[in-house]
Structure formats: structure tokens, C-alpha cells
Amino acid sequence: MKRLFLLLALFCQLTISVAQQADFQKAVAKYKTAKTVTATATKTSHKNAVADDVVSKGTLLMKAPAEVSITMEGGKDQLLMQGSTFTMTVKGKKHTTSSEKNTQFRSFQTVFESILSGGAKDISKLGDLTTSKQGNILQLTITPQADSKKAARRMMFSSFVLTIDTKTSELKSLRMNERGGYTEYTFSGYQFK
């Protein structure tokens, strides 16, 4: 009886993973033929201790196979992923890391590489990724797992939330949650080339 229950639970999980991967592949199918994707970006920085949010405008540039750039205020603020290298520029000061050294960015890199390949990379086996779908919106939540309490304290972000419009294949938003607030990028005016 226990074996039967275990097999049934395993089968259900496998079926759910396959369905989630299929939803994701449909949502990002448009990226399969696009080499470059551009959009207008709006960045909202929210700090719990501050009453007003800081809002700025910029651009999103995505290039296959693994480059994502969100540039704000003429380059003073930038979030850049080039393969496994991540560069964050805040008020002109650069901070660089890689997904090989900084594990919180591993799944983030895999998800974006999968988006840019039109879903060719399988994301269903990522242990720190959950997906949900409501109407035309597919939400991907990456919650990085720390190896120790010390590593958890050093993490810049507690989670990343991406929303994709399944009808238009557009990445609608990227939210990076951190202690005491969040940074959210919303995107519009897409051009697929």
C-alpha cells in the first residue's frame, strides 16, 4: 500500500512538472525565432522604511543566447546578465558576481536562458522554482536556497518573481525581493527582431 501511494505521488509530481514546462514553453515560444528583444522598462524601488517609492525609466535589451540588460537613467543603474556573469551598477558603482560562485543566481540564469531559447532549456527540475498560472499570466518564483545561515544572511535577494503574458510572450515584470523592500521592473512596448 505504501509503495502504491509513493508511486501515485511520484506520478502526480511528474505530471505537474511536465504540464508546467509545457505552459512555460508556450509562453516563451516567440523568443525561439527572435535574436534581439527590446522594451521600455520602469524601475520601482521600494524600501519599507521610506514612504515614497523611487521610480525611473529605462530600457530592456535581451539577446540570444544569454544576455539580458536593464539600463536605467543613461547607464547609472544597470542590471546585466552575460552568461553566468552578473553585473549590477547602482549610482555608477559596479558590483559583479557569477552564478558559479553565487548560487542565488543559478536558477535565475537558467530561467532567462530558457526564455531566450524559447523554452528549449528544461526548467521543471529546478528545485527552487515554482510556477503558477492565472488567466494569461504565468508567474515564475525563484526562491534561492542557502547552504547555511551565514550564506542566507549574505544573500542580496530572498526571491525573484517573473511574470510572463502567455498570449504575447512578453515578460511583464521582474521583481527582486530583498530585506526591507523590493526592486520591481515592469516592461512594455516590446519589439521582437
Indicate residue ranges for each PLM-predicted region.
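Hydrophobic lipid-interacting interfaces of membrane-associated proteins
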Residues: 44, 75, 179-181
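Sec-dependent N-terminal signal peptides
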Residues: 4-13
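Short, surface-exposed coil-to-beta transition loops
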Residues: 54-57, 74-76, 82, 155-160, ...
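Flexible, processing/modification-adjacent segments and terminal tails
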Residues: 22-25, 30-33, 40, 45-46, ...
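Sec/Tat signal peptide C-region and signal peptidase I cleavage site
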Residues: 15-19
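Short hydrophobic/aromatic-rich beta-strand segments that constitute the beta-sheet cores
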Residues: 41, 68-72, 86-90, 140-142, ...
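Gly/Pro-enriched, hydrophobic low-complexity segments
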Residues: 130-193
